[in-house]
Amino acid sequence: QRQMCIRDRYPNVVIIKAFTKIFCMPGVRLGYALCENAALRKRMRAMLQPWNVSVTAQEAGVAALVDCEAYLKRTREYIKKEKFWMTEQMRKLGLNVWGSEANYIFFKGKAGLYEKALKSGLLIRDCSNYEGLTEGHYRIAIRSEEENERLITWLEKL
């Protein structure tokens, strides 16, 4: 619904979505584009390869869409709950955490945190190469409760 509103208000905006993250399909190249501008849609279609989606990706996409409303609702509720908990825990540790609508948490921590996490078997995104950001800016994804607790426990020990 939100995407439809954006399309109506901004006809030259193209919204691109992938199944990869929300449906946990790493490596499966499947997604879609929403575009109100007919001329732009025609140009985009002209650039597509004749067989641009594999049979495997098509089957995975169809399977993902079965009961997807219930799945998406559960997923959003889980992410909201875990993100709230993690944000609170990180703030208690003195980390500067920014709010977002995404399934990840953006925060400012000590320089070198990425390397320390890697040595401990944890993966966080070093955002220091993003334009306008400096060393010490990181991003973490909301994962399983066990993985989230492991990350918080690790941060507490630093």
Stretches found by the model and what they are:
Residues 2-6:
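Short, small-residue-biased leader/transition segments that mark boundaries at the very start
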Residues 35, 107-110, 142-144:
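Short beta-strand-to-loop capping motifs
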